[in-house]
């Protein structure tokens, strides 16, 4: 599943590529991709003649601010001659990704949503396993109330609210493993299997440790490791092990730099011990038994 760095890579690509992209036509190729409104016709009607004004990210959610253009559309700056039109929100889930296509051509087999501008450029959403979802939340409605997962997210790893004091507070009585805690989106937003493993390795903490046993100095190191690992991955365009692509169809390169993730049986880059793998809460976990205590 795309995690924070992959979603942030997509967000940056969308923001750069879709400058002044005005939606003139929407085609829903798979109804189940539209999570809200209940009728796809309302989803299509809500997006038509909207400016994709600004792209944000919250955890693993992409959030586009929309502007509805009036009679003066075509005048610049467009946002001055328009009114707010709510949000287009996307969760890529397991295999979803966007592709920008100049002079739109026939859709591929797994195309789920097609969005066109008046120049026949297309923003195409492709999803092999079809778990990804989109919401059009009209102006006046609360995205956090409509999308349960969005409203329950914990702080962003880069925010000032995510520090060792916060971590100590949320784990002080937790008997769960620290790996399970990091995967809990209500505790910290955006971290998944790859970056939990890599951050714990960088911090020298065993993924099997009970969260409540981790000391303050270890929490400081863990927080710093999380931020560093995520920033490094964003700088590399995220990680591609299966379906993730950026807007240009390119793979992320961080997978070439991982220290433990998917390196089972290979030598630890620090100590030479072999990397091991075991499941925690149904998720494959990779670690170095010598470097992580």
UniProtKB/Swiss-Prot annotation:
Textual note on the cofactor: Binds 1 zinc ion per subunit.
Q: Could you tell me which SMART domains the record lists for this protein?
A: Fapy_DNA_glyco, H2TH
| Gene Ontology biological process terms, A to Z | base-excision repair
* ZnF endpoints (FPG-type): 259-293
What the entry lists under Gene3D superfamilies is as follows: 1.10.8.50, MutM-like, N-terminal (3.20.190.10)
Could you tell me which PROSITE patterns the record lists for this protein?
FPG_CAT (PS51068), ZF_FPG_1 (PS01242), ZF_FPG_2 (PS51066)
Extract the GO molecular function terms from the UniProt entry.
8-oxo-7,8-dihydroguanine DNA N-glycosylase activity; class I DNA-(apurinic or apyrimidinic site) endonuclease activity; damaged DNA binding; zinc ion binding
Instruction: State the function annotated in the UniProt record.
Output: Involved in base excision repair of DNA damaged by oxidation or by mutagenic agents. Acts as a DNA glycosylase that recognizes and removes damaged bases. Has a preference for oxidized purines, such as 7,8-dihydro-8-oxoguanine (8-oxoG). Has AP (apurinic/apyrimidinic) lyase activity and introduces nicks in the DNA strand. Cleaves the DNA backbone by beta-delta elimination to generate a single-strand break at the site of the removed base with both 3'- and 5'-phosphates.
Q: Which family does it belong to?
A: Belongs to the FPG family.
Protein's recorded name: Formamidopyrimidine-DNA glycosylase
């Amino acid at each position: 599943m795309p995690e924070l760095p992959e979603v942030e890579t997509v967000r940056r690509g969308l923001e750069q590529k879709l400058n002044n992209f005005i939606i003139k036509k929407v085609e829903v190729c798979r109804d189940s991709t539209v999570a809200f409104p209940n009728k796809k016709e309302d989803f299509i009607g809500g997006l038509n003649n909207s400016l994709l004004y600004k792209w944000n990210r919250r955890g693993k959610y992409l959030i586009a601010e929309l502007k509805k253009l009036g009679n003066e559309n075509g005048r610049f700056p467009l946002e001055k001659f328009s009114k707010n039109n709510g949000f287009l929100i996307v969760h890529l889930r397991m295999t979803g990704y966007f592709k920008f296509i100049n002079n739109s051509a026939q859709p591929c087999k797994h195309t789920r949503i097609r969005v066109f501008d008046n120049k026949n450029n297309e923003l195409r959403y492709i999803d092999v396993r079809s778990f990804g979802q989109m919401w059009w939340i009209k102006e006046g409605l609360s995205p956090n109330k409509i999308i349960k997962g969005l409203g329950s997210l914990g702080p962003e790893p880069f925010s000032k609210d995510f520090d060792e004091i916060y971590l100590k507070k949320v784990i002080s009585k937790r008997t769960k493993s620290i790996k399970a805690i990091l995967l809990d989106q209500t505790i910290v937003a955006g971290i998944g299997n790859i970056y939990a493993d890599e951050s714990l390795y960088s911090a020298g903490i065993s993924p099997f440790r009970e969260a409540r046993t981790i000391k303050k100095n270890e929490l400081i190191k863990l927080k710093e490791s999380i931020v560093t690992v995520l920033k490094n991955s964003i700088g590399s365009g995220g990680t591609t092990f299966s379906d993730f692509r950026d807007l240009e169809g390119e793979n992320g390169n961080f997978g070439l730099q991982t220290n433990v993730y998917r390196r089972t049986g290979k030598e630890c880059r620090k100590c030479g011990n072999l990397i091991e793998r075991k499941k925690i809460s149904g998720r494959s976990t990779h670690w170095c038994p010598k470097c992580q205590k």
